[in-house]
């Protein structure tokens, strides 16, 4: 299935490109999410007529992502968790926990854009990737400390 991308999508293509994707991915994800249009001649002409609007919207989204990235860089993430004698956590720190941490600070970062590179199951410093936009990716440090009982 060929689609016209309405925004930049990592590993697939940029705004306005006609790319070939799996039919299910196009029908079930890209098109319903408003990220693509089926590549028909009618849709191509509609896209070209509205191309400037799409580009302006993408520039605005990129600017918002860069602003959010600056705020993410300012915050030091410290998570307090109960741990055993060998500094192993009872459970783990997940992307949902990190999203809740940011939400408590007033930053809207959904858990699906937070990539925990390695499972966080011990005390100490860990690296996590936050994909705010295909062009704006930050690697942040998370400090996990023992919770005081």
Swiss-Prot record:
Keywords annotated in UniProt: Ribonucleoprotein, Ribosomal protein, RNA-binding, rRNA-binding
The organism's place on the tree of life at top rank: Bacteria
GO BP terms in the entry: translation
Any one Gene Ontology molecular-function term assigned to this protein's record: rRNA binding
Pfam short name (any one): Ribosomal_L9_N
Task performed by this protein: Binds to the 23S rRNA.
Family under the similarity heading: Belongs to the bacterial ribosomal protein bL9 family.
PANTHER family, A to Z: 50S RIBOSOMAL PROTEIN L9 (PTHR21368)
Protein name stated in the entry: Large ribosomal subunit protein bL9
Organism of provenance: Magnetococcus marinus (strain ATCC BAA-1437 / JCM 17883 / MC-1)
